[in-house]
Amino acid sequence: MEKQILCFIILITCISCGLGLDSGLQNKQLKEPTYSPNYAWQLKLDGRRIGSQPYTEGQYFYLIEYLVGTRTVQLVKIDMETGVYVWKADQISDGEEWRSSNVVKADNKLYFMRPNSGLIYCYAENDGKLLARIQVGATEAEAIRNRCSLETIVTDGTALYWGSKGEPGTAPISGHLLKLDINTIDYTKHSTVQICVPHSLYTKGTRYECTFWSAPIIDGDTLYFNTYNRDHPNGYCSLVSIDLQSETVKWEKQLHGLQGRVNNDLIIKDNILYMLDVTALLRVDKHTGEVLTRYDDEKDPPYTQPLMIPTVSLCGIWYDGGRLYYTTVGSTETASQTGMSKDLVYSLVCIDAKTLKFLWGFHPVSGTSSTYPVVKDGKAYIVTHIDGLRVFDAKTGKLLGVDKSIIAWGDEANVLYKDYFIFFNTNFKTNRATLCAIRV
């Protein structure tokens, strides 16, 4: 099935679902078992999580908050043992409240990028002091071209890596997989913006061949990424492996029929690279790039297979015990919009990681989500958009319980820390979020 149109339609549907919290939807829902969370702590945030994912290391949680009612953001450090702020960095007011890259850590420093300006901010991990602001281009225009695509950067501890947006238009500029060595940064000049120009590890001749819509990942000394090529004249995207020591391409595969447009579509487990696209699911040998297993979505009706296509804005994929868990494009409107049977529509699925075959799924009650479930001791926990906190038997998919007092935007990444499932609970009226930890 060609779902590039479907993804857009369902995205609009999900937004409209979110606006109808009091529309009587609950009266249409079947009676479901209830779940009563055992809270370890709850922290009311100063604002809400911004459009970027948090970073965790040890017992600490690093988050960029959007301060409600302002155009201001701040980086914060939270103790996951106690649920209290450790520090709050100085606020940033640069005219863009929503978008930041994810937070990464190298040595004892934290980094994130503001894509609106092409600036990287660096902070001390121990106290949150600003150490540097770096413009990733010789000019502001070049920095904008070099900014990260889809707000994602990664690090191997010595450098920062990201896929750039390039530039559309009558004379389009191709995107690049960029590298910025952090030893080129002067950490004593925090009061002024310094210029550090990254260099390219990978590009193509035209923007149609090299645009980035998915997050790269690092495994050891190797970086993996795929390009976005929906408009590629030959209809394929490229899956690439780069050796970070030699900065050379280890292998590159042309994947015909794939678009490479899912935000966080890659995960590596046991030497296998999994790629989830809007048209196909792949299982790949990470050393050679050989496609070991491929599942292609149905292109035309009548549809007979379960809906297993991931949502475009996927936060990530959870792996547990030879299974992959993730959210799809499915919502309550999917059946009427596509002609699919409601029995085939799922907003959360569990598939066999070796065969890529469907094992179980959750039929959506209202809006879908782009987050992922966390699996602990045979149970899968997920905070959905409007459908509440839901707990499933991770093996069978049986719904064990629901707490509908917990709601979220559905696009937040969850965290498993020891025996704590940590998630965001949002008050839609105030747009304030509470970071919660429950014992699981």
Locations of the language-model features?
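A short loop-to-beta-strand structural motif that recurs across blades of beta-propeller domains
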Residues: V73-V76, L119-Y121, G175-L178, C237-V240, ...
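Short loop/turn segments that connect beta-strands within beta-propeller blades
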Residues: D79-T82, A124-D127, D181-I185, D243-E247, ...
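Aromatic (tryptophan-biased) beta-strands that constitute blades/sheets of beta-rich domains
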Residues: L21-S52, Y62, Q74, V84-G95, ...
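Short glycine/acidic-enriched loop and turn motifs that connect beta-strands
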Residues: L67-R71, N116-L119, G166-A171, N229-N234, ...
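Blade-level signature of beta-propeller repeat domains, shared across WD40, Kelch, NHL, RCC1
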Residues: L399, D403-V440
